[in-house]
Amino acid sequence: MSNVAKRINIVSIKMVKESSFLYQTRTISSPNDAYEMIREQLEGLDREQFMIACLNTKNEPTNISVVAVGTLNKAIVHPREVFKTAILSNAASIIAFHNHPSGETTPSQQDIQLTNRLYEAGELHGIKLLDHLIIGDGTFTSLKEKGYL
């Protein structure tokens, strides 16, 4: 058995602001408020993107994070990646968003399953998933309004 010492790194984790945009409504109080905040970021893209908005205790967005960029019809999303930014942001809650490049906003079975996984993971972390919006051509579907949350 070797008694050779092993070096352990001391690290820090930081978030870096990449850009920003103005948003008039300070508090998110409805799915439409959330859609108005994110629509310019997700409409018209040629591949799926999955994003989250981190909110404080007053339901004010503190940041938006791109979690995954996928292909024409799917993006691979893992709860670990979703909650990484939320934890670093000290978020009280999150809203999930992704686009459907086809413009059709009907949730797929995979969309519903992911929403359920994110809800459960949020409960474990103490970060509530308020909604999951699917963004299409000038429209959106709220999975909360559809009864999936």
Residue ranges and their predicted role:
Residues 69:
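Glycine-rich nucleotide-phosphate-binding loops and adjacent flexible coil segments
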Residues 8-66:
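Long amphipathic N-terminal alpha/beta scaffold segment
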Residues 1-14, 24, 33-36, 56-58, ...:
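Active-site-proximal loop/helix of nucleotide/amide-processing enzymes and allied scaffolds
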